[in-house]
Amino acid sequence: MKMIGFEKPFKLEEGNLFKVYEQRKPTPENDDILVKVNSISVNPVDTKQRQMEVTQAPRVLGFDAIGTVEAIGPDVTLFSPGDVVFYAGSPNRQGSNATYQLVSEAIVAKAPHNISANEAVSLPLTGITAYETFFDTFKISTNPAENEGKSVLIINGAGGVGSIATQIAKRYGLTVITTASRQETTEWCEKMGADIVLNHKEDLVRQFKEIPLVDYIFCTYNTDLYYNTMIELIKPLGHITTIVAFNEDQDLNALKLKSITFTHEFMFARPIHRTPDMIKQHEYLEDITKNIESGHYQPTTTQVFEGLSPENLYQAHQLLEKQSMIGKLVINI
């Protein structure tokens, strides 16, 4: 099997250190399935992981994947060879930048049948992230009627996570306010279903003068930059969740006056620690498939590269590090 990996952490300005590696195709054990990978999607987390310590070389990144089940472990009950599946994987295992991959069935689901592989692969990592935010941290109802009258502010609505988060929030009855700054990103947010799109290059507090404070805020970009703004825009007893780690010290006491709940969302926590409820990721992906097939969600792929190669992977990382992507970037293997 072919893999694209690297021997040591590197920054892009050091040049392209991705290389092709070959190894024997693995055999699935326990609850693992062996997937022949058809397409992958590259995420910002790939660019961050590329710069982290390599404990076992070569490091093979890649999280989003779609492919065909080729073999199953003895404990597998959810899938059979021939099933077309999608998933987001885990950073503590070999990634999807390869022609074959082992993955636990608990974080996998059958892919939607009414869209292409290149479209479907845009959804697992960002979709699970958004589902965990809305249902595990915000604890919104699965009944849309019970969420009516509640609102969420999604910072950076045109990114990969923001794009699917907007659709999920609308599907389950929330009023959605997102942020963007360019005409094309504003139009994309509206296409995803946002009720209001604000300009995050301008003062958000001032733009909220005619908008009620929100119940929830989902920060998908630069938590440090928006920390104090989010505290101003959230309702008392509201809930803020971020997927972006702090790079500066922040005053947690600032949350006290409104009794704000603040949560970090990390969708890899379940597979890394093999939590007892890891199966939730399978269930969330199943719901994504159901909503794609029923027409409630749309895929978020905006760019496709042909062929898994060091050159394509390096170019994908370059595009993501510019932080101007709309939707998701996919590599068709």
From Swiss-Prot:
Record has Metal-binding as a keyword: yes
UniProt keyword Zinc present: yes
Matches recorded under InterPro entries: ADH-like_C (IPR013149), ADH-like_N (IPR013154), ADH_Zn_typ-1 (IPR014182), GroES-like_sf (IPR011032), NAD(P)-bd_dom_sf (IPR036291), PKS_ER (IPR020843), Quin_OxRdtase/zeta-crystal_CS (IPR002364), YIM1/Zinc_Alcohol_DH_Fams (IPR050700)
Molecular function GO terms recorded: oxidoreductase activity; zinc ion binding
Signal peptide stretch: none
Membrane-spanning intervals of the chain: none
Family annotation (NCBIfam families): adh_fam_1
Protein name in UniProt: Zinc-type alcohol dehydrogenase-like protein SACOL2177
Organism the protein comes from: Staphylococcus aureus (strain COL)
